[in-house]
């Protein structure tokens, strides 16, 4: 199998071009780079600079003020090593070596008025782009969700900006190979705008053809992961690839910091799916019954998202 991660132009997909190649990519890989989608490095820089300044210079009181008191509520600031994807996926107990700022369509926690203005604009651009690419996924697979495409895409998205600082020696690859554990996304599509490590190390990797492959930064290109919801709503026509964030070796620690702006196009809480189909597709679903809602699934999946100790 060809393990190359392809690049598609959203504008060309919208013109009906490259449909056979796009369908093969959705079926076999479930990830691709996307250009011409209205998201560039310039928009990312404005939002990134603001949140990195808050991460580095915000006081403890300011950070507490925008930290959600509800562990499963993905809003506001989340401190370094406060979450564990490994715990969520039952693959270990190590923390995610990152800090995070999260926002959605409502109930947000903003550090300032300027932050709210810039981040709301950035969120809206991400939401527009994610819906546009999701339309192409649905069109390419001949999928018409219950209630229609536009109702399905008028949903409950989530934006999470992760800052992965330079790792300490005890989190180097020799000690702990991963900054974040392998997982698939509970989304229709996930859009990622990343910045590279200064030393050239590629941290983000995804499973392609049975092995994890590097997903480097590409200027003015967005990385798209199809999520488990895409698999389910298309009846299994779309792959939801596992991906993780690798740790650098000791000799790569210097210059290993990076950022990743991750936009999850998630369905509404009452989106209903087939539990047997989810299991058949390889998803870890412990719910009873023939059908379940997205809220049922995500509620159980993220019950352990916030770490309670450094153990």
Swiss-Prot record:
Residues 154-267 form the Fe2OG dioxygenase domain. The keyword Iron applies. Keywords: Antibiotic biosynthesis, Iron, Oxidoreductase, Vitamin C. One of its GO terms (biological process) is antibiotic biosynthetic process. Disulfide bonds: none annotated. SUPFAM superfamilies: Clavaminate synthase-like. Belongs to the iron/ascorbate-dependent oxidoreductase family. Catalyzes the step from penicillin N to deacetoxy-cephalosporin C. PANTHER family: 2-OXOGLUTARATE (2OG) AND FE(II)-DEPENDENT OXYGENASE SUPERFAMILY PROTEIN-RELATED. This is Deacetoxycephalosporin C synthase.
């Amino acid at each position: 199998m060809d393990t190359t991660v392809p690049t598609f132009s959203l504008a060309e997909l919208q013109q009906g071009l490259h449909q056979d190649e796009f369908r093969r990519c959705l079926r076999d890989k479930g990830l691709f780079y996307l250009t011409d989608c209205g998201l560039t490095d310039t928009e990312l820089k404005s939002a990134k600079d603001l949140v990195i300044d808050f991460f580095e210079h915000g006081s403890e009181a300011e950070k507490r003020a925008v930290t959600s008191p509800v562990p499963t509520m993905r809003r506001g600031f989340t401190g370094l090593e406060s979450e564990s994807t490994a715990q969520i996926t039952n693959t270990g107990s190590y923390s995610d070596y990152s800090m995070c700022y999260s926002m959605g369509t409502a109930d947000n926690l903003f550090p300032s008025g300027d932050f709210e203005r810039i981040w709301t604009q950035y969120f809206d651009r991400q939401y527009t782009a994610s819906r546009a690419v999701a339309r192409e996924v649905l069109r390419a697979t001949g999928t018409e969700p219950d209630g229609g495409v536009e109702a399905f895409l008028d949903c409950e998205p989530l934006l999470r900006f992760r800052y992965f600082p330079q790792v300490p020696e005890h989190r180097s690859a020799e000690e702990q190979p991963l900054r974040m554990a392998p997982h698939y996304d509970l989304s229709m599509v996930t859009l990622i705008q990343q910045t590279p490590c200064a030393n050239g190390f590629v941290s983000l990797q995804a499973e392609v053809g049975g092995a994890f492959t590097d997903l480097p930064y590409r200027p003015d290109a967005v990385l798209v992961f199809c999520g488990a919801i895409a698999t389910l709503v298309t009846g299994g026509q779309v792959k939801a690839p596992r991906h993780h964030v690798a740790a650098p070796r000791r000799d790569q620690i210097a210059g290993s910091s990076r950022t990743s702006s991750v936009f999850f196009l998630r369905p509404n809480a009452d989106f209903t799916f087939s539990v047997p189909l989810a299991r058949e597709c390889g998803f870890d679903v412990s719910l009873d019954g023939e059908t379940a809602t997205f809220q049922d699934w995500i509620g159980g999946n993220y019950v352990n998202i916030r770490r309670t100790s450094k153990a």
